[in-house]
Amino acid sequence: MPPVLRTVAELRARVSDWKAAGETVGVVPTMGALHEGHLSLARRARAACDRVIVTIFVNPRQFNNPADLEKYPRTEAQDAALLASVGVDAVFAPGPEEVYPRGFATNVSVSGVSEPLEGAHRPGHFDGVATVVAKLFGMTRADRAFFGEKDWQQLMVVQRLVADLNIPVTIEGCATVREADGLALSSRNRRLSVEGRARAPALVRAMQAAAEAMRGGRAIPEALAEARAAVLAAGFETVDYLELRTADLLLPMERLQGEGRLLAAATLDGVRLIDNIPV
């Protein structure tokens, strides 16, 4: 089993030894409740770096709903066993007081790319993400960091963060891992009922149909409206957004020109699912 480090001091001592030996360090930031998507990131890190750290920290600052924070699954023993199978070198699993000690007063806010979509529906969420990610990069001194494309907006926020603050880490975006029926892997999926799980792939199917329609010349507003209607017809309770945006800055796209991204968030069984695909 990989060692589970609880303090910044332990982590820094370990990383200092690796750096002194000239080894490269990769980090995979997670909130635990690991699944095959996380493991694919760890494998990618394992292939690219001499040493791999996976962080497990349920970050209270990125939850704007306390009930969501409470419900978030915590499965550290299972997570460590899964990571052992991948061969990671260390797990960093600090408590909240280690990351945010008494008197902590700094907030990192990335404007622009963090504001629409998830930012509009979850105020403060990306400030919490940016703050903890900036801290993790400082703590781990990572050369590379691995993030899933499933959280596309988060990936864009992190890329902007490291560019603007000159943080010397390379951000690697890794393809979304999906179930056989197309559902994007997510720690939240385990909260779906059996019936909800069967309905959940309707989200990505509607998105794929919209992308195909737009490529075929369908007007963008019509294609998006049809996709939203299809998601609701499949049994989802709400659609927070289903929008076409530029891939990098997440600006609204009026026509297909350059790289676009179709991003969606919808609620099923009271569980908020997000997804995105290239267009």
UniProtKB/Swiss-Prot annotation:
(R)-pantoate binds at Q62, Q154. It is found in: Cytoplasm. Its EC number is 6.3.2.1. ATP binds at residues 31-38, 148-151, 177, 185-188. Its main location: cytoplasm. Keywords: ATP-binding, Cytoplasm, Ligase, Nucleotide-binding, Pantothenate biosynthesis. It catalyses: (R)-pantoate + beta-alanine + ATP = (R)-pantothenate + AMP + diphosphate + H(+). Pfam families: Pantoate_ligase (PF02569). GO terms for cellular component: cytosol. The active site is at H38. The keyword Ribosomal protein does not apply. Pathway: Cofactor biosynthesis; (R)-pantothenate biosynthesis; (R)-pantothenate from (R)-pantoate and beta-alanine: step 1/1. It comes from the Bacteria. Beta-alanine binds at Q62. Homodimer. Belongs to the pantothenate synthetase family. The reaction proceeds by a bi uni uni bi ping pong mechanism. This is Pantothenate synthetase. It comes from Cereibacter sphaeroides (strain ATCC 17023 / DSM 158 / JCM 6121 / CCUG 31486 / LMG 2827 / NBRC 12203 / NCIMB 8253 / ATH 2.4.1.).
